[in-house]
Regions:
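Helix-loop-helix hairpin linking two adjacent transmembrane segments in secondary transporters
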Residues: 124, 128-178
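Transmembrane alpha-helices of Major Facilitator/SLC transporters
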Residues: 242-265, 279
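Paired small-residue
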Residues: 93-102, 293-301
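Cytoplasmic helix-loop-helix junction between adjacent transmembrane helices
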Residues: 98-136
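C-terminal transmembrane helical hairpin of 12-TM major facilitator-type secondary transporters
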Residues: 268-311
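A late C-terminal transmembrane helix in Major Facilitator Superfamily
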Residues: 306, 314-365
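Conserved MFS/SLC helix-loop-helix module at the cytosolic interface between two early adjacent transmembrane helices
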Residues: 53-93
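Helix-breaking motifs and short loop linkers at transmembrane-helix boundaries and internal kinks
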Residues: 35, 67, 88-93, 156, ...
Length: 392
């Protein structure tokens, strides 16, 4: 079975991540059935990040001590529990519980599955194992809304069938995890994941983390609010299209993270910030002119910018951090990212109540563009100062 460990673990990774974005095209149906507005939608979406952060901080070090398999199986169990709660959901509190459980599954799975996929890679795939893990992770996130959108639009039982299918995918993922050999040497210690930013990496961390914040805020916006943009601003009530828009930002991010892997970190973050600015300009145009093609273009361009700035920003931070503190620094970076995927989108929901969805979306886009511009200016200033120092 060892020879099949690599593809089986990659499948399990993707299958579990599918469930974390599966509800995206369904939020409009839940809103109609339970009579809630965009603000409640954003809160339901954002509770996912709370589950991720709890799992990351409480259990982030456990797989090094107890092994990859137990933690992956715990992630599968959380994913199954989330799907079951969504099957029974008839109130907002149950939707919140389902999202928290979904976040727990992602938090338990993401770091552990990434390590397991890399460790299980055969020699011929060692140099591409990290890219495979990235594609499995982000590809699963993108497949979730696409699958659900198609099922909600064209299949019966739109609030049940997507979760029944995901239960099947998750059960197969659990079997895959159970049958493959353990990949960890179990040399770590159980404990809470520490967070820190050493002084020698602080400047780079602040710039990279701000870029990651901007990119993940956009990802949260498209995942939580894009269906509302589509129906309420553009006037198209097609759940498959809503799912495809959410999918496109993840697909663009995944492909970019793989393609930009060898690009110089600082330059990649700068280019990523520039693309985020362009993406937000396109989003503003899409909302002003109620244009579907422009909204899709905004998702793709923003996904490229997010993927480039996030992945290469993480590389810049980790490369400069002391070896013994890299886990702490990278965990702090991920905390910033998951805060970004939740709090700003709740702000969008609050703004939509008083300003309207279109104006709130434009305000969000301008704010993210300003943040990305600050990061870009900081990078260019640091490069100019370094060149001046070298010259003198």
């Amino acid at each position: 079975m060892r020879r099949f460990s690599f593809p089986l673990l990659a499948y399990a990774f993707a299958a579990i991540m599918v469930g974390t974005t599966l509800p995206t095209p369904m939020y409009a149906l839940y809103a109609d059935r339970m009579h809630f507005a965009v603000l409640t939608t954003t809160v339901i979406y954002a509770t996912y990040a709370g589950g991720v952060l709890f799992a990351l901080l409480a259990f982030g070090r456990w797989s090094d001590a107890v092994g990859r398999r137990p933690m992956l199986l715990a992630g599968v169990a959380a994913a199954l529990a989330s799907a079951l709660v969504f099957l029974l959901a008839d109130s907002v509190p149950l939707l919140l519980i389902g999202r928290v459980l979904s976040g727990l599954s992602a938090g338990l799975f993401t770091g552990t599955a990434t390590a397991a996929v890399i460790e299980a890679a055969p020699q011929a795939w060692k140099t591409r194992a990290a890219a495979v893990a990235t594609v499995a992770n982000i590809g699963g996130l993108g497949a979730g809304p696409l699958l659900a959108g198609l099922l909600v639009q064209y299949a019966p039982q739109p609030l049940l069938l997507p979760f029944l299918i995901h239960i099947g995918l998750a059960v197969l993922a659990g079997i895959a995890v159970f049958v493959v050999p353990e990949t960890s040497a179990r040399i770590g210690r159980i404990g809470l994941q520490r967070l820190s930013v050493p002084n020698e990496v602080r400047t780079v961390f602040v710039i990279a983390a701000l870029a990651a914040f901007a990119g993940f805020a956009v990802t949260g916006l498209f995942t939580a609010v894009a269906p509302s943009f589509l129906s309420n601003v553009i006037g198209i009530s097609n759940h498959a299209v809503a799912g495809a828009i959410a999918c496109s930002i993840f697909a663009a991010s995944a492909l970019t993270q793989v393609a930009a892997n060898r690009m110089a970190a600082e330059r990649a973050v700068a280019v990523g910030c520039g693309l985020l600015i362009v993406g937000m300009m396109i989003l503003t145009a899409a909302l002003c002119f109620s244009s579907l093609p422009t909204l899709i273009a905004a998702a793709v361009v923003s996904g490229i910018g997010q993927g480039m700035s996030f992945s290469r920003g993480l590389a810049a931070v980790v490369d400069r951090a002391p070896a013994q503190r890299r886990a702490e620094v990278s965990s702090t970076y991920f905390v910033v990212a998951y805060v970004a995927i939740s709090l700003p989108v709740i702000g969008e929901g609050l703004a939509a109540q008083s300003l309207g969805l279109r104006t709130a979306g434009i305000t969000f886009a301008i704010t993210v563009a300003v943040l990305a511009a600050i990061c870009l200016a900081a990078i260019l200033f640091a490069e100019a100062r370094a060149k001046l120092s070298a010259f003198t």
